[in-house]
């Protein structure tokens, strides 16, 4: 259909530029009214695992246990919606209202017609990252940014976070990474390259401007330039 891997990267860069222009990191504005957009998201473990925008992370959840997820595409702020409390146990009250007892409206939307409350965000997608779990390894199941010593990268396609060593950029026992961080701006993980719906990416493996780490008889090698 005339769609290339470079188109994917160009589209992502346009989304980032639009997001930075639309949401210039204002902490006094909730982005909920803008709908499903690509933006910086924080998962609130205190409230129940929903995701909130930067403004709400500061104005409504500043003293809560937050997980910084960085950019998420097609996501609407959960503050003031039932999604914010998605992990809270079901009670008669929650079954009737959609909210647990003690739930609070979004403080940045109190003057809106719904007084800071809103309907569920049915299109939001929640990965394990929202529960504070990252990467595909055992270490990532209990991720702590205060103690994590290894660099992590976010896949352009699935937006999952992976340890440098888990992408084979830094094989076990190596003294330096196979590909320096100075040599790339974007990463696409192995799982996304192998998916049928993104198979077009495989045509670019090893092409100019597309570095790929592949296994060989001695371990790993870098193909491309």
Provide a role label for each language-model segment:
Residues 1-225:
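PHD-type zinc finger and closely related Cys/His-rich zinc-binding mini-domains in nuclear regulators
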């Amino acid at each position: 259909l005339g769609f290339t891997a470079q188109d994917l990267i160009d589209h992502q860069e346009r989304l980032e530029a639009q997001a930075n222009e639309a949401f210039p990191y204002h902490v006094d504005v909730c982005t909920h009214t803008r709908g499903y957009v690509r933006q910086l998201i924080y998962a609130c473990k205190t409230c129940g695992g929903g995701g909130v925008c930067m403004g709400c992370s500061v104005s409504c959840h500043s003293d809560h246990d937050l997980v910084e997820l960085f950019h998420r595409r097609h996501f609407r702020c959960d503050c003031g919606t039932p999604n914010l409390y998605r992990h809270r146990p079901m009670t008669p009250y929650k079954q009737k209202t959609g909210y647990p007892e003690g739930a609070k409206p979004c403080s940045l939307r109190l003057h809106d017609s719904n007084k800071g409350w809103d309907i569920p965000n049915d299109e939001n997608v929640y990965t394990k990252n929202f529960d504070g779990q990252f990467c595909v390894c055992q270490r990532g199941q209990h991720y702590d940014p205060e103690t994590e010593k290894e660099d992590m990268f976010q896949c352009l396609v699935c937006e999952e976070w992976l340890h440098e060593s888990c992408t084979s950029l830094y094989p076990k026992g190596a003294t330096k990474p196979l590909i320096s961080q100075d040599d790339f701006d974007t990463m696409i993980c192995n799982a996304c390259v192998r998916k049928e719906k993104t198979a077009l990416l495989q045509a670019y493996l090893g092409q100019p401007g597309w570095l790929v780490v592949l296994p060989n008889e001695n371990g790993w090698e870098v193909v491309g330039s």
